[in-house]
Amino acid sequence: MSETKSIYINIPGVILAFIFESSLIFIFSFINIKYYKGKLSTIIIGGLGFICSVFLEGIIISIITKIFGQNSIMIIPFHLTFPGLFEETGRYICFKYILKGMNKDKLTSISYGIGHGGIESLLIGISFLRFIFIKETLIEQGILKEDLTFIYTLIGALERFITVFIHISLSVFVFKAIRENNIKFYILAIVIHDFVDFFAFLYQKNIVKNIFMIELFIIFFAIILSRYSYNLYINLENKKDEKIEEETNFSLKDKKVQ
């Protein structure tokens, strides 16, 4: 029987990371609703959109894996492209159909992004506890490869915080694609999503072994992306309700006649 590799886990760090990552959706939602008048329903739809997208992706990946085999090089392109394709298509469908009545308000894009990124952070925060309870199994499966120090958990928590901003940014991209009937922003969202995930793939496959370098790159990239999407958001205009606008115009004309 092979001896399980000894790996150190900083339990206080894991618990703090769990608390921080799990609370992000509540913190962002509170700020969005309290200070910017965002809608809770949109945040919930964003979370459900993420869950449905990942669920469908998992089913398709499972079928492909059965066809080609777990370790086949043929499934790599699917692992690299499906996350962006499914999640951004989920965003597109939600904005186009489910949230059609709320698309007049550009804040819908932010609220949806909070739900999407927040629920992902919540689920990852919960899964962080597995490092404590099933440590040996994760080591044997190759999921836990190195010491889980306090600094490591801190950077992981920070990366989750930054990832929420990435999801908000991508939501702005897809929202703009719907609002302006410009498909290139939807395609760009898919490409950006898969580009970010590609670096996680490099670490998982031991192509890049320095996790700190990957995390720092993602943080740096997220700052640039957030700045660009903020400019897109600012330039979006809230559409007025057509009925209200018609009534207002009619009222103004009526006053002029009098």
Predicted ranges, named:
Residues M1-Q258:
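Hydrophobic alpha-helical segments at protein termini of multi-pass membrane proteins
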